[in-house]
Amino acid sequence: MYRTDFASRALAVAVLVGLLAPGVARAQAIIPGETGTTFNLTASTGYITSADGGSLYTWGYGTGAEMQYPGPTLIVNEGDTVTVNLTNTLPVPTSIVFPGLEGVTATGGAAGSLTQESTGPGDVVTYTFTASNPGTYTYRSGTRPDLQVDMGLAGALIVRPAGYDAISNRTAYGHPDSRYDHEYMFMLSEMDHRIHEAAELAVTPADFAAIDTSNFRPTYWFVNGRTAPDTLFPSSYPLFPYQPYGSFVRGKPGDRILMRIIGMGNDMHPLHAHGENSTVIAQDGRLLASGPGAGADLAYSDFTISIVPGGTMDSIFQWTGEGMGWDIYGTGAGYEHGTCTSDQFNADDVVNNDTGMVTADGNGNGYADGDGFHDVTWEYCADHGKPFPVTLPGLLDLAFGGFYSGSPFLGHDDALPPGEGGLNFNGGYHFMWHSHNEKELANFDVFPGGMMTMFVLEPPGTPIP
């Protein structure tokens, strides 16, 4: 059954209050999921919630008796022989396909149009493959995907490269071009509530066969199975027992943030990251390389990444503040933050921050030239000490958002009227990351919502797990 009370404003407040509550975990820059080589998934029915108070009858995969949306993220290592056992408690046959993975074998069940299908609880299908190539993948129903993917039968699969280490060797593809400091998943999907209502009311095989998806018209859009502003809650937050994955992003200047983007639904979606372009390094589980060992030499920079259904893309987002034209840490009394010098004795900029290697002495003066950024804080040295280019209006002439610290300078806060602000813990910069298809920023026509989350740029030194 679908219901809504259009309580988006109240729920948005609840989200933000929840983020402030003592004991609530902050967003973590590591992707949660299931690890191992054998995964026992059950396809079952349940309900998920939307941020406007709606409840949607849903089908999903889970590791126990209860489904989740999206399905559990499966995390394996390059070279692993992986086994996925599918048990089906749905009222219709179902299956799993693994786009981009080679040599998948299926045993048990009954023959379907794309792969073996499970027809009921006692009919387990086993899928086996070797995780030969590292990267980001998806898995989804291979049985009438026009219906079953919209109903929720999809999830993510990550293949870690050989030699991966979560502390000392974070790469997505085993090549330095794919190194990162933090990683986040963006599983983009949509639902048409009319299809879900029809599936909930269906009883006989003929009823399910009669569900018409040709007039597919989504009314909800999701990031990792949640609609905004629910996307801002941490993963495993108790309000969302069947939607465990959050998508709130955190990083510091210079951090390389790996965006694992998946087209989990049946529509194409353009994901737009405010704040800086990102560099697309891989597509469909393959590094954008001209040949073996070339690295991501075919990578490209873009401000909006369009992801197709069933496809995946990996992109590196890195915010440095280069070329802002003013000192983002402030100038004058109260904003002292040392020096930012290059190409001289005792300079702050000696190494290439991305590689950690001392830079060359190109002009022959005996000092490393540097890369233009402070070796510790990533401050862009050319802007050090440059004043803020405008005079800020007085408080009476401003309207405030909850994430405004009262100061334009990173890591600082300033006076605000009573009741304003309060959601910016560290004086960070907040940017919206969202679909660039504006109609997807709504929950059942209630704006704002839908396919939207936030990125907060934290000041240097802020711990990010």
Label the model's feature ranges.
Residues 2-6, 26-465:
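Copper-binding active sites and cupredoxin-like electron-transfer domains
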Residues 10-22:
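Bacterial N-terminal signal peptides
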